[in-house]
């Protein structure tokens, strides 16, 4: 199998495309800060960085609500999202119209088998994570094999598309411990001039290079500039295990845009107002007694007096310090209520047709799909074309 990389290693090719991704990566992190900070943290190293919790939870609720609605529509539980049919005209042309019922029965058997495979897999759990990345960052990469569905966030892959939006090239970056690599490959690495024994004690970067050639995708993996043996792969484009998704499509751009990005202004305003209200309320809750230094009542007398005690003094010498900002707080609360209502509408957190139940009917699934389509201006249609159809074809191919 031949790969044309113009003399570049997969690592070099990855680094050359990272710059084109930087803008989208930065926007994704900004959106994650005010929704679910742990989803796309500032640091992508192996150590867990300290994450700052937002003062409001509307953003997180919105992302989870919208992701859940997409999940229930794209992969509804105990409900097939597809129906296999055969072209009746083709049967008539071949004079086999009498086999229609028998063929339909066979197709129902295939449908049930596919649906059962989906139910027992981890696909729904992985897809929910992927949908949250789509809502926040607008981009996610899925890898579907018989072992399950793997999710690559935006920080772990780069890609190129043509003007129409077809995927031309994908590179992923992962880390792996050297002991997980083939022993003969490790021996090959040790023979290199730039071999560092200390570095080989830590996790190593592995790059996967996926490239489209005509109607096929081919791929291989690389580590330390060397191709890893037995990592070659090939598949037809329509049944590829690599499913690259975007939320909001922009013509001519390799990456999509996140839904949160469109409402980030409201979320930032809500965050600032909630911080002011919370900090102001904490200051208002603090009780301080002021004592007239020229009066007959002494501060020490009050400080040492237990509850219900009788002490000598004058009430006029004592006052309670008040912030006096209740009017300002009420204005902020009104603005918070207005913004919250707008965001709840935008993220479909208002009353919906979906019941709080483990199973939903086909009618409810159709109503949710219609709600998503009407509210999100065709974004649901993009996901049906870029996820449901490739996912189903890949599942049938497996």
Per-segment meaning from a language model:
Residues 108, 112-123, 132-136, 212-217, ...:
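A broad, structural surface signal
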Residues 129, 285, 357-358:
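Residue-level detector of alpha-helical recognition elements and their boundaries
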Residues 12, 136, 144-305:
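Structured, contiguous alpha/beta core segments that scaffold functional sites
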Residues 70-88, 93-103, 291-398:
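Long amphipathic alpha-helical segments
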Residues 53-55, 104, 111-117, 214-215, ...:
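N-terminal start-of-chain detector that recognizes signal peptides
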Residues 1-190:
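Extended, helix-rich architectural segments
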Residues 114, 142, 157, 270, ...:
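Generic structural hydrophobic/aromatic packing signal, biased to beta-strands
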């Amino acid at each position: 199998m031949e790969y044309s990389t113009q003399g570049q290693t997969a690592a070099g090719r990855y680094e050359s495309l990272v710059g084109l991704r930087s803008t989208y990566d930065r926007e994704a992190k900004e959106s994650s800060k005010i929704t679910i900070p742990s989803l796309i943290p500032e640091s992508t190293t192996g150590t867990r960085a300290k994450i700052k919790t937002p003062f409001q939870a509307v953003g997180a609720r919105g992302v989870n609500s919208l992701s859940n609605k997409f999940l229930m529509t794209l992969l509804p539980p105990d409900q097939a999202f597809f129906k296999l049919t055969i072209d009746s005209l083709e049967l008539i042309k071949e004079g086999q119209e009498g086999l229609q019922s028998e063929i339909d029965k066979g197709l129902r058997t295939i449908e049930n088998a596919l649906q059962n495979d989906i139910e027992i897999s981890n696909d729904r759990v992985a897809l929910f994570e992927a949908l949250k990345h789509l809502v926040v960052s607008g981009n996610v990469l899925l890898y579907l094999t018989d072992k399950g569905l793997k999710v690559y966030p935006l920080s772990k892959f780069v890609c190129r598309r043509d003007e129409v939006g077809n995927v031309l090239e994908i590179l992923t970056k992962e880390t792996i411990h050297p002991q997980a690599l083939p022993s003969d490959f490790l021996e090959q690495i040790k023979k290199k001039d730039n071999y560092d024994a200390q570095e080989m004690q830590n996790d190593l970067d592995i790059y996967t290079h996926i490239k489209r050639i005509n109607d096929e995708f081919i791929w291989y993996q690389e580590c330390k500039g060397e191709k890893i043996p037995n990592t070659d792969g090939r598949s037809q484009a329509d049944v590829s295990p690599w499913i690259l998704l975007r939320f909001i499509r922009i013509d001519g751009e390799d990456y999509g845009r996140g839904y949160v990005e469109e409402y980030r202004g409201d979320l930032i305003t809500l965050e600032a107002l909630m911080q002011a209200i919370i900090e102001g309320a904490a200051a208002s809750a603090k009780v301080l007694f002021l004592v007239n230094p020229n009066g007959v009542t002494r501060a020490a007398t009050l400080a040492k007096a237990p509850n219900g005690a009788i002490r000598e003094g004058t009430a006029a010498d004592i006052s309670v310090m008040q912030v006096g900002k209740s009017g300002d707080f009420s204005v902020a609360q009104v603005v918070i209520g207005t913004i919250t209502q707008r965001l709840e509408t935008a993220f479909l957190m208002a009353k919906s047709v979906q019941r709080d139940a483990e199973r939903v009917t086909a009618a409810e699934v159709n109503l949710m799909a219609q709600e998503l389509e009407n509210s999100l201006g065709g974004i649901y249609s993009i996901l049906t074309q870029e996820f449901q159809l490739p996912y189903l074809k890949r599942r049938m191919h497996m």
